[in-house]
């Protein structure tokens, strides 16, 4: 069948250096449920496994759960896979929130504000920044008791509390001690109280470990601790309607504020006091903590009754967005919420009012259908039309872009309770506090950061964020709605060509270029480890790659890894030479094309850039590539184009986008032509479970069109899965009305190139990195199954031969790792996709018994199951895991080398080396005839050591060398040509041995095998001669020695 062809947008992957300039000072703290509060420096030093290291930075594997803001707006515990240490010299900013903590960050580190994510150097006093309302702790009694027993081991001999009630009493007591700042006079105290006091001192190591213990202890124990503290130090301020702690040291107040977050209570910190106010906080205080003293408890009830409101939420734009999404005008809401309009402009609504607003909005507008007909022009209603004009939906009698968009949203009912629930989650989990001041200072030293799945974490009780390389391109969509807008796909970001033209319009005109591509599709999972997963028909899914190199650091290990991968997959690429803004004296003009920006620079800065570019060009030449600055390239098929950029400031992004578009169009046009209506082909990026949908696959479609209800064939664990598409989901476009954070659009079809989530039965066993093929007919299904099984069988290995066990996260990365191992002639017993299991360890153990060198497991981008860890540790099976293929293999090869050296050292320690000696014929060199015999000898061949047995020419044993002496010095060894005296235990001169006689070191068969098979490289010529001489002697009695 013949289908219409058109050019699709090219698929672009980003590899190489990850721009990681967003860091914090070493002393900034994160709070981990398993460890309590810990500075970033301590967190880094606590981890041992280095993933990457150079002169400027070090990345270590972390694998510890920590509080983050989840995509649904809730504070969650998610694993932070990596922690960074980066060398930094330059400006730092300390952001201090009003009546709260501060945090010191590099200028580009973003904070979540009511205006979205804002960089530290763009914050100003008065901006509102997100602070978590709750910090989850451990809340696991068994783990806490384990921690207590471990801590007290050998330190204190008292009976520990045995029940919850006793522990709660102890924590209450500890809180009172903390409230008195540990100033308790033990005189006159009972034995029981003294014991509790001793337990307090050891467990809490006052004041150092208080916060840690309180984040590891069950929350009810924490509540009792706080009650004890507030009973001693707490007051009810009836005038200000708040609970206060007065006169405590500021450090204690800061610790206390973080402890209160475990219960969802946000306090205010003043120089010498702490206050809890607002109805929500006071009610939580009463529920969890309260006062034991009746008068204070009564006063607390009084201020709660008089407190009408809780925290305020100045989320004016977000309120307008969700109101319009659900079809309300301001006037409509004002009938239910008095004076509603002020909450979108000047007065931040309190928690209580905001909840009332959201409850009203969630019910939807009764007049929505009427509003649709008005926007469609079918009905005229003067009042609504005037409202729509004020809202910016109608201008000059026509619908604006916003009006058109809302009409589509209302018609399709693209909103439901989940939109409201996201905002509820934000309000329940965060408060927004104003920036009080921002201090700037110079810093020279190490800074730290943590990588998390959601690109954010909580430091010093403040939410901070780190970004990806695509952020700068995405940001260009702000105020570019009329240009079509950058849209988010599953696993990809689409940049329409209109946006490229908007960013790079002047350049396109200057170069007289015509771009016919519909856009660019950037894969959202940058890095070489993701690239290896992007397979399509045996090659790379990516049509083109951007290799990002820090122009100041030059080639790094990940650069070399990326080049090798690009070469292996024959993927064309361009080079982005990043961080030109770090060149001394570089003049920055944000979002400016490089060719315009360079005209602002002085000669010295230009020369420095030229030098750095020539260094890069030289390195590329070493790897077999001709390279040049992009505007100097004569032939793009023969020369690599290097675009100097600053991802941080947007300099050179215009040229990069135009170059990608131009090269794709000129050289990849035939590849980009797809059959629009042809059956779809794609690659699975990820398999994940979605609430309400079951197991789904995130897929990049690179050919054809996929429809709902299509039959698809998908690569599975050990089979091809045939299933039917139940739903196709794409994220909502990134615009001001829809909320794309966790919402999907259900669509009937998707055309390449696109990222899509597929919901279908039976996807539990689907393999990341494997193909997805649409199959319209039964014959197509069979062909697709055969094709997919061929691909899987070519990568997944299962044999009985001696070899390593290989595990990877996707089919593509498994293939890449296996190829590298095969090229290095490292045999593979088993290669499969998935985490490392106990079965893998047992398989490696069976190999280890045959050949220890190969009894190992290599894992790329995978985790090790707990039971597998335990068995591997017990059976001493080495497991190597990492996310850089060559580094993984390097680590394994280094281990082999170390093991061989260790084995060699062990063999050297126990093996007997060959040696032949001759007693001097002169009787003067017989120093003692027996017990032991001491004689002068010369080593004729080989070597001798104390402890070796000597034999005669006829094979008869004559005794053992007890010691070797040269003049006044005892030796551990004597070699060929040395004249020494030796003491021989068991020999009598004149009976067993005689002056002038030749004696041989007695070797066993095992000695000979070890020497010739395992230690051949350490044997010298004289050792070989000695071995042959000994073999001749021993061959008379044992035929084995004839072969030596």
Swiss-Prot record:
SMART domains: HintC, HintN. One of its GO terms (molecular function) is translation initiation factor activity. Residues 173-265 form the DOD-type homing endonuclease domain. GO terms for cellular component: cytoplasm. One of its GO terms (biological process) is intein-mediated protein splicing. Pfam families: GTP_EFTU (PF00009), GTP_EFTU_D2 (PF03144), GTP_EFTU_D4 (PF14578), IF-2 (PF11987), Intein_splicing (PF14890), LAGLIDADG_3 (PF14528). GTP binds at residues 524-528, 578-581. Keywords: Autocatalytic cleavage, Endonuclease, GTP-binding, Hydrolase, Initiation factor, Intron homing, Nuclease, Nucleotide-binding, Protein biosynthesis, Protein splicing. Residues 451-668 form the tr-type G domain. This protein undergoes a protein self splicing that involves a post-translational excision of the intervening region (intein) followed by peptide ligation. The keyword Metal-binding does not apply. Belongs to the TRAFAC class translation factor GTPase superfamily. Classic translation factor GTPase family. IF-2 subfamily. NCBIfam families: aIF-2, intein_Cterm, intein_Nterm, PRK04004.1, PRK14845.1, small_GTP. The intein interrupts the GTP-binding site. Function in general translation initiation by promoting the binding of the formylmethionine-tRNA to ribosomes. Seems to function along with eIF-2. PANTHER family: EUKARYOTIC TRANSLATION INITIATION FACTOR 5B, TRANSLATION INITIATION FACTOR IF-2-RELATED. This is Probable translation initiation factor IF-2. It comes from Pyrococcus horikoshii (strain ATCC 700860 / DSM 12428 / JCM 9974 / NBRC 100139 / OT-3).
